Amino acid sequence: MGWIRDRRSPSSMEIRELHNRDVINRGAFKSRQKRTQTLITSKCGENPSPFFLARSIAIAMGIRFIVMVMIYSGMIINLLFNQEAPSPLKESYCGPCPKNWICYRNSCYQFSNESKTWLQSQASCRSQNSSLLKIYSREDQDFFKLVKSYHWMGLVQIPTNRSWQWEDGSILSPNQITMVEMQNGSCAVYGSSFKGYTENCLTLNTYICMKRTV
């Protein structure tokens, strides 16, 4: 008859029991899977791979290098900006000079374009509280390379012994300049290469005035 239940069909109670059993099995599987993942992670943490170690060491060394570079850069910058300027040597000191005069070491120089006799040139320099050029030493050779023509300097020859004397009364030293006799004369012009040339004192020449700053 149609209303008689088929014994092979599962009852509702059996269906619920199967469903509960399936839920329990799924929960147990997920729990085992989670424990497995946790175990794998813990093992990886306990025994890291060589690649992981190498990468970690490389990163640490890179960070250390950057920090060291920043520290040394800061030290160098601080040293450069805070370094005291060296005090100038006395021999290189150059004080104030009059307008249109050239300052070199401890002296001021004026190169005149006027041509005068030796006495006229001397008077012109004295009117400016200076004297005709005097060579103190060959250490000034770089400066006197600028001299390209003949100029009167403060050097005259003493008739009695024919020695050369500067305006201030000091005797010419071989370490200052070398005298070259060109013609009869008791005055001298400066040429170049630390050489002085005898000249007639009445000859017209340009001249160089100088004054010490110290």
UniProtKB/Swiss-Prot annotation:
UniProt-annotated location(s): Cell membrane
Any one Gene Ontology molecular-function term assigned to this protein's record: carbohydrate binding
PROSITE patterns according to UniProt: C_TYPE_LECTIN_2
Keywords: Adaptive immunity, Cell membrane, Differentiation, Disulfide bond, Glycoprotein, Immunity, Innate immunity, Lectin, Membrane, Receptor, Signal-anchor, Transmembrane, Transmembrane helix
Domain of life, source organism: Eukaryota
Biological process according to GO: adaptive immune response; cell differentiation; innate immune response; positive regulation of natural killer cell mediated cytotoxicity
GO cellular component: cell surface; external side of plasma membrane
Domain C-type lectin per the UniProt entry, residue ranges: 98-210
Disulfide bridge partners, by residue number: 94-103, 97-108, 125-209, 187-201
Glycan attachment points: 113, 129, 161, 184
Transmembrane segments: 57-77
Segments in the Cytoplasmic topological domain: 1-56
Topological relation to the membrane, as annotated: Single-pass type II membrane protein
Positions on the Extracellular side per record topology: 78-214
Expressed in which tissues: Detected in peripheral blood leukocytes, macrophages, monocytes and natural killer cells.
UniProt xrefs under PANTHER family: NKG2-D TYPE II INTEGRAL MEMBRANE PROTEIN
Subunit comment: Homodimer; disulfide-linked. Heterohexamer composed of two subunits of KLRK1 and four subunits of HCST/DAP10. Interacts (via transmembrane domain) with HCST/DAP10 (via transmembrane domain); the interaction is required for KLRK1 NK cell surface and induces NK cell-mediated cytotoxicity. Can form disulfide-bonded heterodimer with CD94. Interacts with CEACAM1; recruits PTPN6 that dephosphorylates VAV1.
Function as written in the Swiss-Prot or TrEMBL entry: Functions as an activating and costimulatory receptor involved in immunosurveillance upon binding to various cellular stress-inducible ligands displayed at the surface of autologous tumor cells and virus-infected cells. Provides both stimulatory and costimulatory innate immune responses on activated killer (NK) cells, leading to cytotoxic activity. Acts as a costimulatory receptor for T-cell receptor (TCR) in CD8(+) T-cell-mediated adaptive immune responses by amplifying T-cell activation. Stimulates perforin-mediated elimination of ligand-expressing tumor cells.
Note: Is not capable of signal transduction by itself, but operates through the adapter protein HCST.
The protein, known as: NKG2-D type II integral membrane protein
UniProt source species: Sus scrofa (Pig)
Lineage: Eukaryota, Metazoa, Chordata, Craniata, Vertebrata
Gene name per UniProt: KLRK1
